[in-house]
């Protein structure tokens, strides 16, 4: 079997909900990191790209009708380059990278752009059609996140808990205390603040320039979601999201955000032909399914399955990027895997609680950040894993070259 190499990875800053990137359409946002890859790799014959595989969780608004193809065209890729959009909700862009790697390892492709985009600020309200003339049963749904147009049969079978409710379920089932969740969130904020102060994320971010009606364009070059001023005392004052006495709060959960990320993946032949630098090898990936009501726990079985598949151990992982959808689910996973709550390998530069979680882009962000951390620390293996709504988990391992 052939190898699949990551040769470049870049992302936009992650914007706050209704923040600096809210003025940018999802398809335009998705084009930005692709265009950056084109600019950063001038030796590549871009007409020879075999595919663009982009993740996106919503696809109900400006990201409809194959946003991957739209972003590819807007980025300036030749029309001959095909593109597709995949949807595994939160795991979409990590799935896109895994799909690209499989195609290259199988010899079906040599050069693929994989990544994802999400504009949660611009997620539309939608309304279904009436089933009869002059119907009055239509309901307006907010597509920002979570369920819409719920199937009553699925509801009866598995329930349709909101994402915060699933985190509360995990906290209760696995005994994750509020204080531990807040400590985890605080650590995430502190690690991100330290990384930002050192300029750590600058090398993985392409600035977004937003024209204004009057005056100079606004340039967004820094993640907007982190709150360096977060304190444990402040977190303790927040009320539960699901219920007043609940443990899941806005402070120990990820954000609602906007962003995009793209990764250039190449075969041995493409690396040689275009004189590219192979930075990491994609070793293996996997997905699992669990009960939807505790979807946040899914990374634990996904990681166990993947390590067995790759014949590796958790001790061999130098970097572990575990998406922080909620502190409750992240802690349930790390504890099940036998990791300490403050393991320095887990999200060493903070995670989604601080950086934000634009659903379809987050997986590619994990890989981008993990790659840079491996190179900075001299580590060998990085593990990236995410929980996924409706009860799934995904995991992927890369090896620094």
From Swiss-Prot:
The molecular function terms in GO held by this entry are: 3-oxoadipyl-CoA thiolase activity
Q: Which InterPro entries match?
A: PcaF, Thiolase, Thiolase-like, Thiolase_acyl_enz_int_AS, Thiolase_AS, Thiolase_C, Thiolase_CS, Thiolase_N
Q: Kindly tell me the pathway this chain contributes to.
A: Aromatic compound metabolism; beta-ketoadipate pathway; acetyl-CoA and succinyl-CoA from 3-oxoadipate: step 2/2
What SUPFAM superfamilies does the record tag this protein with? Answer: Thiolase-like
Q: Which residues form the active site?
A: 90, 357, 387
Sorted UniProt keywords? Acyltransferase, Aromatic hydrocarbons catabolism, Transferase
In terms of PROSITE patterns, this protein maps to:
THIOLASE_1 (PS00098), THIOLASE_2 (PS00737), THIOLASE_3 (PS00099)
Question: Gene3D superfamilies annotated for this entry?
Answer: 3.40.47.10
Q: What is its EC number?
A: 2.3.1.174
**Catalysed reaction, written as an equation:** succinyl-CoA + acetyl-CoA = 3-oxoadipyl-CoA + CoA
Gene Ontology terms describing biological process: 3,4-dihydroxybenzoate catabolic process; beta-ketoadipate pathway
Function in brief:
Catalyzes thiolytic cleavage of beta-ketoadipyl-CoA to succinyl-CoA and acetyl-CoA.
Q: What is this protein called?
A: Beta-ketoadipyl-CoA thiolase
Q: Which organism is it from?
A: Acinetobacter baylyi (strain ATCC 33305 / BD413 / ADP1)
Q: Identify the gene encoding this protein.
A: pcaF
